[in-house]
């Protein structure tokens, strides 16, 4: 019994302390008599997750633009440096029609967000290591990539809590150690530079998916029949 109470207390502390996403202890609106349970509404959690996703997308766009200005030579034809064309992953397909959007479940949305977050943790860490080998890399670019990695980890924890609250389940396990890196194709010319550019471009694209899916989930909490991805 004592061990169970201790475990419950630690779980309550963890839920209240996920940095930057779940907010401060003052946001805990409901507690059990022991003071160990911290309850934040799904709506508040989604609002904070959306804020994180919006910032991640914005900073990813800034980092990509800065990298392009600094390291992509003007002599390379535009069609060779368009990073979006190098994103070959079909891990998460965005529904197109209104009927598809209406048919997808909250579970599908949360699982998709969880997958997108997980597959990008390793590539962003590798990108930081790669940038350390560049000459005259702007400190602002290093800061932005580190910031994205940190916020992505925060978003991962927030999504886990949302899955626990909304679906009563834990994390989604990736099959066969799925990695986004093997889905990114870099041209032979200046391969490492264009590969890093492709990583930034593809991450920006998937960061927008995360933001869009979270906003759809938030809209559904209001029972709005017109919720859409577009």
From Swiss-Prot:
Pfam families noted in UniProt: Hormone_1
According to the UniProt entry, its GO molecular function terms are: growth hormone activity; growth hormone receptor binding
Please name the SUPFAM superfamilies in this protein's record: 4-helical cytokines
Q: What are its GO biological-process terms?
A: animal organ development; growth hormone receptor signaling pathway; positive regulation of growth; positive regulation of receptor signaling pathway via JAK-STAT; response to nutrient levels
The set of disulfide-linked cysteines is 28-38, 87-202, 219-227
GO CC terms for this protein?
Answer: extracellular space
Please name the source species: Ictalurus punctatus
User: What family does the entry list?
Assistant: Belongs to the somatotropin/prolactin family.
Glycan attachment sites: 177
Q: What subcellular compartments does it reside in?
A: Secreted
Q: Which PANTHER family match?
A: SOMATOLACTIN ALPHA ISOFORM X1-RELATED, SOMATOTROPIN,PROLACTIN
Which superkingdom, per the lineage? Eukaryota
Give the principal location in a single coarse category.
Answer: secreted
Q: What are the boundaries of the signal sequence?
A: 1-23
Instruction: Specify the protein name.
Output: Somatolactin
Swiss-Prot/TrEMBL keywords: Disulfide bond, Glycoprotein, Hormone, Secreted, Signal
